[in-house]
Amino acid sequence: MTEQKYIVALDQGTTSSRAVILDHDANIVSVSQREFTQIYPEAGWVEHDPLEIYATQSSTLVETLAKAGIRSDQIAGIGITNQRETTIVWNKETGKPVYNAIVWQCRRTADTCEKLKEAGLEEYIRENTGLVVDPYFSGTKIKWILDNVEGAREDAEAGKLLFGTVDTWLVWKMTQGRVHVTDYTNASRTMVFNINTLQWDEKLLKELDIPLSMMPEVKSSSEVYGETNIGGKGGTRIPIAGIAGDQQAALYGQMCVEQGQAKNTYGTGCFLLMNTGKEKVTSRNGLLTTLACGPRGEASYALEGAVFMGGASIQWLRDEMKLLADAKDSEYFATKVDTSNGVYVVPAFTGLGAPYWDAYARGTIVGLTRGCGSNHIIRATLESIAYQTRDVIDAMQADSGIKLSALRVDGGAVANNFLMQFQSDVLDVAVHRPKVTEVTALGAAYLAGLAVGFWNGLDELADKAVIDRSFEPHHDEEKRNQRYRGWKRAVKCAQAWAELHDEE
């Protein structure tokens, strides 16, 4: 019997598929990554080829094992984390998708969403799925495929078609069609899953004309779903033992498994999740209620808020404003001035996300005086990321009644020490940056490792989650509140721009 020394995390993202091998000390041993094609058939439409997703993901698994010289019989289990909401429908007899995957960013089902609102279902959807009515989620995408692909509706009614988010599709392919399953975190992003009963919501399936027979079985995020022989030699079968959507996997990888623990992922936008434990909190402040993972990978509730423009606003300074040659330089220039000199940048380029949800707001720079230079604008742009994060955290605290004790952070922008310190100052809480920033892959690996007994419990992993640096707040309260009031006024200016346009 060969000793099983490793866990593999498959990280299927929006632009690339990755495979990450971890050892027993949660060190990353090997990584392999492949990008795949983004398909834009019409303005606002985004698709992927499901077969290409599977091909890139399975090849990274084989490649990363080969690169590290690790045999498949040394792998204790596989954890999967994935881009959420992206929708795949396939024929279970042929194994072929009936249409491309409709990606989470795709806006083609806006009309269907309007009809759901007109039918008075907004409140029902919020109460029972935790979500707002939006094309972002899977439900209306499934309906679109059944309504628009020739023969799909008939085949679905005849029980020939299956639906899955990306995790479900990968597991189905990796087990040669033996296992049709998803986990609670992915199911909670479909807009047809009832987060109170933890069952598919038959009322919403009926409303969208989706047969229940298409839907996968829903299980916890940490258990053995099936086995795969991909990368296996001589009949080796590797258990697939963990599944979580990318943001929930990051929350778990950051060890935010107890009520009141929260993380912020600073990517193109920012994704904030706060674990609310066994208590479902319905937001009155524009946040989503979703399912996350408790200590053993069981379902727990969370609040989620998204900021549209995080790192993307730094790219704007570089690409459009030409104020930076490299995004990394933003920290250097921001620290060349002591303050932003009363300048606020509101990067509402595509409207404002949580908690405002104002699609018509537009970007503004306010408070300019003759003494303002490019460094002030760079600094104010970085500050805007921290202010927007506070907007969401304030909403989370108001909804849940839970005071945040510390914020865990991950994503590209966390390397910016100025931003992290300012974030701590604005929130008046400590900001913890982990040493291993691959927290999404870590989360998937932890979930799989716990299910197969590779690790005994999260407490065994706690000492592996080493903090690289903690940023402590060090500004007086009066200054903090004064600055934040200025930000709120600046946001009103961004919103008023659209309102004034209506009056013309």
Curated annotation (Swiss-Prot):
InterPro entries: ATPase_NBD, Carb_kinase_FGGY, Carb_kinase_FGGY_CS, FGGY_C, FGGY_N, Glycerol_kin. GO terms for cellular component: cytosol. One of its GO terms (molecular function) is ATP binding. ATP binds at residues 14-16, 268, 311, 315, 412. The gene is glpK. Glycerol binds at residues 84-85, 136, 246-247. Pfam families: FGGY_C, FGGY_N. It comes from Aliivibrio fischeri (strain ATCC 700601 / ES114). Belongs to the FGGY kinase family. One of its GO terms (biological process) is glycerol metabolic process. HAMAP family: Glycerol_kin. Its EC number is 2.7.1.30. This is Glycerol kinase. It catalyses: glycerol + ATP = sn-glycerol 3-phosphate + ADP + H(+). Pathway: Polyol metabolism; glycerol degradation via glycerol kinase pathway; sn-glycerol 3-phosphate from glycerol: step 1/1.
